[in-house]
Amino acid sequence: MRILITNDDGINAPGLEVLEQIALQLAGPDGEVWTVAPAFEQSGVSHAISYTHPMMIAKLGPRRYAAEGSPADCVLAALYDVLQGARPDLVLSGVNRGNNSAENVLYSGTVGGALEAALQGLPAIALSQFLGPETEGLADPFECARTHGARIVRLLLERGLWDGEDYRLFYNVNFPPVPAANLRGHRVAAQGFRRDTSFGVEPHMSPSGRRFLWIRGGAQQSPTLPGTDAAVNLEGFVSITPLRADLTAHDRLAELEALIG
């Protein structure tokens, strides 16, 4: 199996090393694992692509590259340059440091990398490690993802739904903020939304007197509705959420047509 991996935390992020280990387990001794990841931190860039300026790319080692772009850029660089036409059998994005559940899905570069792979017609999975009080004292905060990641991905490869429609299916996987031994299992869960974690800005003044703003988010430990992604994570389960690129509110189409059509 040929596997392409990327992330949004950058080429030197510890979660990428975790994903490389997961991918090596899946690829097997005769497989290939290719890494094309951002040269710098790209958290929060969602599905952005750098079509207004060129992207520098550097080979760091065998099958390992850093690109000065977003996770979606990295997927494009891999498919149309690095791999020289060879198609990966699977694209994995992560393992993100922090959860990409609930509204974080919409901001996540990790999810954006998987989304671009799906739009290119490839099976793709985004993986993230929820962090919390139970992971703070661990020598490896990615312990849960490292221990159970290959099994969860293999489960999706063997039993998951994959299709060839225009807005292809891909998966968002979040590992709960618990030690690996405390994992309670996995749950298929819809994307949820938190009520008190909206982003805002925090103003500051520089030493030279210039005003600047930091983007600030809310607490991540707030649960979503029962049975949705962040809620099951906080109960100790891996959340597995099928996603599509289609953002249409299909449940509102007929009602809107009746009102204004």
From Swiss-Prot:
Source taxon at top rank: Bacteria
Species lineage: Bacteria, Pseudomonadati, Pseudomonadota, Alphaproteobacteria, Rhodobacterales
Reactions the enzyme catalyzes: a ribonucleoside 5'-phosphate + H2O = a ribonucleoside + phosphate
Named cofactor requirement(s): a divalent metal cation
Cofactor note: Binds 1 divalent metal cation per subunit.
Main location: cytoplasm
Similarity annotation: Belongs to the SurE nucleotidase family.
Annotated binding of a divalent metal cation, by residue: 8-9, 43, 96
GO cellular component terms, A-Z: cytoplasm
Pfam families registered for this protein in UniProt: SurE
Localization of this protein: Cytoplasm
Nucleotidyltransferase found in the keyword field: no
Job of this protein: Nucleotidase that shows phosphatase activity on nucleoside 5'-monophosphates.
Enzyme Commission numbers on file: 3.1.3.5
Protein name per Swiss-Prot or TrEMBL: 5'-nucleotidase SurE
Tagged with keyword Cytoplasm: yes
MF-aspect GO terms: 3'-nucleotidase activity; 5'-nucleotidase activity; exopolyphosphatase activity; metal ion binding; nucleotide binding
Keywords: Cytoplasm, Hydrolase, Metal-binding, Nucleotide-binding
